A protein has these predicted regions:
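Membrane-interface loop-to-helix entry segments
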Residues: 57-73
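Membrane-anchoring alpha-helices and their flanking helix-loop junctions
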Residues: 1-57, 77-133
Length: 133
């Protein structure tokens, strides 16, 4: 991707943002793979619940309620850093807003499905950032 940026914009060469952005993208993708593995059969691509779905609260989910969305934010923070312009920042802010709306909808569905168990889990863990206790 960096080669593409340099090819399309020959005067553009900022190694620190490129390196930092790629590191963030790799971390985000790796985080995403770990999260999907931890979810296993509980992975649902939409903000819905399934009849056999179980509440996952271990692994990365013991720290934050939505590590999958956190992985997306880390990945696209890397994209924004690589782009090194206002468009990348605006896109990232829009993504944050959209994900928060989606998370709220998903959490309402999880409260309906898991009730008090999910509400207790919400009290113990942060939405996207671990709670410090």
């Amino acid at each position: 991707m960096g080669a593409l940026v340099i090819t399309l914009y020959p005067g553009f060469y900022m190694p620190i943002p490129l390196i930092a952005g790629f590191i963030l993208m790799i971390v985000g993708m790796g985080f995403n793979l770990v999260v999907r593995k931890e979810l296993g059969k509980n992975w649902v691509p939409l903000s819905k619940t399934t009849p056999n779905q179980e509440l996952v609260t271990d692994g990365l989910y013991s720290r934050v309620r939505h590590p999958f969305y956190l992985s997306i934010l880390i990945l696209f923070t890397g994209v924004a850093v690589i782009s090194w312009n206002w468009y990348g920042l605006i896109f990232l802010m829009a993504l944050v807003g959209g994900l928060i709306i989606r998370i709220k909808k998903e959490e309402n569905n999880l409260i309906i499905k898991f009730g008090d168990e999910y509400q207790e889990y919400m009290e113990k863990t942060g939405m996207l950032i671990p709670k410090i206790t």
